[in-house]
Amino acid sequence: MVAEDFEAVLKAKYPSKSHAKRVVDLIREKIPNANGILYLESRMTKLLEDNDEPEPFRQRRFFYYLTGCNLPDCYYIYDIQSSKSILFIPPIDPDSVIWSGLPLSIDEALQKYDVDDVKLTSELNATLAHLGQANPQSTAYAIANQVSDHVTFLEFEKKNFDALKEAIEVSRVVKDEFEVAMIRKANHVSDIAHRAVLEKAKTAVNEREFEAAFLERCVAHGAKEMAYHPIAASGRAAATLHYVTNESPLEGKLNLLMDAGAEWNNYAADITRTFPLSGKFSKESREIYEIVLKMQNDCIAVLKEGVLWDDVHLLAHKIAIDGLLSIGILKGDKDEILKGRTSAAFLPHGLGHYLGMDTHDTGGNANYEDKDKLFRYLRVRGNLPSGSVITVEPGIYFCNFIIAPYLEDPVHSKFIDSAVLDKYWDVGGVRIEDNILITKDGYENLTITPKEVDEIETLVSN
């Protein structure tokens, strides 16, 4: 889908009603006769500690999923029996108008959001009481610790603080066309920003210049929020997976790993590129880069509905082992290396994660207690459904803190040639990350940022 296509999709309203119906269906899979209301609250305005400025606002994702509303201090009710939704927005505060202008009106909110009715927040408890009295056998479905003290469910026979969150987490895994368009837009803006980063390589003298270049392009193209703090890691710092200092000088460094993604109306992009600061990969850097690129390309190629993500992650390790054997860092039998889990010294993280309103989106069913170190940090376990969006982000890293115990352990050290390894420490780490939409018969790569060696070197050099 080209840019014009996703822009056309985004002219419509965020499809919150269809999301609500999907969530109700999921609740009824576990509670067949579920009736009553879904109740959600937005994030509330909160001041910084010892300050009269508000904290940076980040909307609750569960609330946004059923409303498409990015305002603070709001409430939402969905009446299961009538399939009608009500959004509650704050009334006019004359003091606030002086500083911030008029807030959204009821009529404007009805035009903007996919809801059946809009009321003022002052009407919330009366509306709850009316709905509870109209159906005494009903249940109020809400999320634990996300109900304000002044809100009452007295007229409802039951309260359930588990089912709603669980249902939304499952529902969010499969994206509809509008949600995919949001992620496409986030990728589109992020691609522009990543290209600006590549173009900065020949003149930059500090990591922070890459962060600045990325942020400037995103904001200029309408994405004022980042999906996460950008990572601009040069040299050996690239072996730190979530390095966010972004303050080191570039002198004497071979490569830069840029992991950054814009957010578009609460939907994330998550893209990583690694490139040579000189415009030309060193011999060792290119060897590692080509291994990681093969890992990514081969793993993406097998993706489609129903594929077991554990198997794709395992494939990445097999390709990494083959590659590291070919350049001499690893030695011995590849099956024994895999069985011993020695490759985890160089690829310690999972191959990817679901992507959506959160960078590490819901529904992955990770098992961080897994005794198998190869799978412990795999954020998605199970089969991939059509409509899910997942990152594919293999990497090879040379982190002394992680690798040193392997060199001291005879189970692993027999598979590692430390003399060859010593040539690669300055490579730091290489990661390549794209955002992939799973389809019934295959996949679509939503990320268009260049990653082939020749493309990368040309963009940096020019």
UniProtKB/Swiss-Prot annotation:
Cofactor(s) the protein needs: Mn(2+)
Amino-acid positions noted as binding Mn(2+) 1 in the UniProt annotation, renumbered to this chain: 270, 393, 433
CDD domains from the UniProt entry: Prolidase
Note on how the cofactor is bound: Binds 2 manganese ions per subunit.
Domain of life where this protein originates: Eukaryota
GO biological process terms on file: proteolysis
Listed Pfam families: AMP_N, Peptidase_M24
Residues holding Mn(2+) 2: 259, 270, 433
Reaction it catalyzes: Release of any N-terminal amino acid, including proline, that is linked to proline, even from a dipeptide or tripeptide
GO molecular function: manganese ion binding; metalloaminopeptidase activity
Record keywords, A-Z: Aminopeptidase, Hydrolase, Manganese, Metal-binding, Metalloprotease, Protease
InterPro entries per UniProt: Aminopep_P_N, Creatin/AminoP/Spt16_N, Creatinase/aminopeptidase-like, Pept_M24, X-Pro_dipept-like
This enzyme's EC code(s): 3.4.11.9
Purpose of the protein: Catalyzes the removal of a penultimate prolyl residue from the N-termini of peptides.
Family, as annotated: Belongs to the peptidase M24B family.
Name the record gives this protein: Probable Xaa-Pro aminopeptidase NECHADRAFT_60613
